[in-house]
Amino acid sequence: MEFKRSDIEIMAPVGSYESLQAAIHAGADSVYFGVGQLNMRSRSAANFTLDDLARIVAIAREHGVKTYLAVNTLLYDEDLPAMRQTMDRAKAEGISAVIVSDQAGILYARSIGLEVHISTQLNLSNLESVAFYAQFADVMVLARELSIPQVRAIYDGIRERDIRGPHGELVRIEMFAHGALCMAISGKCYLSLHENGCSANRGACRQLCRRSYEVRDRDNGNELVIQNHYIMSPKDLCTVDFLDKFLGAGVRVLKIEGRARSAEYVKRVVECYDEALRALEAGTYTPEFAAGLKE
């Protein structure tokens, strides 16, 4: 399958103006970020405020970059006024789309004419779910747990069934291409809530899975021999060395995890994926080339 660089969107994470500038100058096509308490990194990463939205949009538009606002936590009744205020401001300031998982947020965004992208928190894992949410969204983040053949089957199904979003275009598949992975299905983890009373599903993950642990048999007290002590911490995702297969499965938006990361990290990762995409377009992408990008 042949690819044009312009067909693929690199979406970069930003938690500061430094990261925003780094993403833009590294070649990102879009950026995503959060404001306030209604996003999945509200307490574990830097966040902007509603008053920052106009400036963010202005900077991004100057460089032809789209802006996506994450409003993707679990919402309770007491959160709905803040959700509406956030989305009203996003609409007024010209945010390109909001990334949402709660149905209340999805419905409100659509009611005010704000474009919706379906968040990974909805764990979309099959074609029927994609077909259902197509009435609300043109872009959907599929579950990270899917295999490449499973993603390809959904992509083929979208085309065969002509599944289109509100703008009349075929639904586009977005997937995480790089960054940290959660030990729980699509981030639905309860460790922080159980241990610290802080819900990861409300943006307050305490990263307990990133700590080192000893594993002991409670019956005899023997410690189990494991490769490392980070028994609950998955290896970070990196698709640059099988990017051709990833795109061949139908992924058109490459999402980079890392709103808590530095501007230098954002710049380097975006540059790597931009370089890989240009190599794919030029026909110079090889395993050796990809391995060099990972170094």
Positions of predicted regions on the chain:
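Active-site pocket-lining/capping segments in soluble small-molecule metabolic enzymes
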Residues: 2-124, 128, 149-151, 155-253, ...
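A cross-taxonomic marker for long C-terminal extensions/tails that follow the last structured domain
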Residues: 136-138
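Acidic, glycine-enriched active-site microenvironments
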Residues: 140-141, 146
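Conserved aromatic-histidine-acidic binding/catalytic patches
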Residues: 142, 258-261
